[in-house]
């Protein structure tokens, strides 16, 4: 995969070099590049200007963004604009992006964008209903969530297939050694070696956690008969 990031602050992305993203680069699975679009700005390197019609704040000008993307060697890339008004990013969207060969992220600053920038864009994406000072943190989050899904980036395919949200449910509780830590013990079923009982326990606990913490996920999750029965049992216990 090839990722190009347009930003005024490329140094902010340094932590990615020591993360799973850096390992993907080392393995040759990812080519990631940062472009300071101020370098392509006309008018004394100014990237922003006042909005026509008046109003608060400054807007990113279209010219530096267009000229920077024109110089990127890309073949039909997915172009993502980080915008609080965009569609909310989630796990299914990360899985979708992980199937792409080329991605471009545009990180904004100031009050907003010249609307004409959006003519370049395929996706307008937000992390949620809040505003950050810039798009860099959002881009780092999305890149990390996407890159870890590229085949062979992390050790085992199943290790991310069982993640919370990948299955549509929150992940079940997990334990490691020691068995007894300060009086808190591992559930006996996990020590039993009975694979079917373990599978059913994990499913029940996954449903329980989802029901208690994110019931909205269950509204769109297609329950099978076993899951319906377990969920009914959980509700009776409440």
UniProtKB/Swiss-Prot annotation:
Enzyme Commission number(s): 2.1.1.228
Q: Name one GO biological process term.
A: tRNA N1-guanine methylation
**Where found in the cell?**
Cytoplasm
Binding of S-adenosyl-L-methionine, residues:
108, 127-132
This protein's GO cellular component annotations are: cytosol
What keywords appear on the UniProt entry?
Answer: Cytoplasm, Methyltransferase, S-adenosyl-L-methionine, Transferase, tRNA processing
Q: Which residues form the signal peptide?
A: none
Q: Does the keyword Methyltransferase apply?
A: yes
- The highest taxon in the source lineage is Bacteria
List GO molecular-function terms, semicolon-separated: tRNA (guanine(37)-N1)-methyltransferase activity
Listed under catalytic activity are: guanosine(37) in tRNA + S-adenosyl-L-methionine = N(1)-methylguanosine(37) in tRNA + S-adenosyl-L-homocysteine + H(+)
Membership in a protein family? Belongs to the RNA methyltransferase TrmD family.
Q: Which HAMAP family match?
A: TrmD
Function description: Specifically methylates guanosine-37 in various tRNAs.
What PANTHER family does the database record attribute to this sequence? TRNA (GUANINE-N(1)-)-METHYLTRANSFERASE (PTHR46417:SF1)
> What is said about its interaction partners and assembly?
Homodimer.
Quote the protein name from its UniProt record: tRNA (guanine-N(1)-)-methyltransferase
């Amino acid at each position: 995969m090839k990722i190009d990031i347009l930003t005024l602050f490329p140094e902010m992305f340094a932590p990615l070099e020591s993360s799973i993203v850096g390992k993907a680069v080392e393995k040759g699975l990812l080519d990631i590049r940062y472009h300071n679009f101020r370098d392509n700005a006309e008018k004394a390197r100014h990237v922003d200007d006042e909005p026509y019609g008046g109003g608060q704040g400054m807007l990113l000008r279209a010219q530096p963004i267009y000229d920077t993307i024109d110089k990127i060697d890309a073949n039909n890339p997915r172009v993502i604009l980080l915008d609080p008004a965009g569609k909310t990013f989630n796990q299914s969207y990360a899985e979708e992006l992980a199937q792409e060969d080329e991605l471009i992220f545009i990180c904004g600053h100031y009050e907003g964008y010249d609307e004409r920038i959006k003519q370049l864009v395929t996706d307008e994406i937000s992390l949620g209903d809040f505003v950050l000072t810039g798009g860099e943190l959002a881009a780092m989050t999305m890149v990390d969530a996407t890159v870890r899904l590229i085949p062979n980036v992390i050790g085992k395919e199943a290790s991310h297939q069982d993640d919370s949200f990948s299955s549509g449910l929150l992940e079940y509780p997990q334990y490691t050694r020691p068995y007894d830590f300060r009086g808190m013990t591992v559930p006996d079923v996990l020590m039993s070696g009975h694979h079917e009982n373990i599978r059913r326990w994990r499913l029940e606990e996954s449903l329980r956690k989802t029901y208690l913490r994110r019931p909205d996920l269950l509204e769109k999750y297609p329950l099978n008969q076993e899951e319906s029965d377990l969920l009914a049992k959980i509700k009776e216990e409440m």
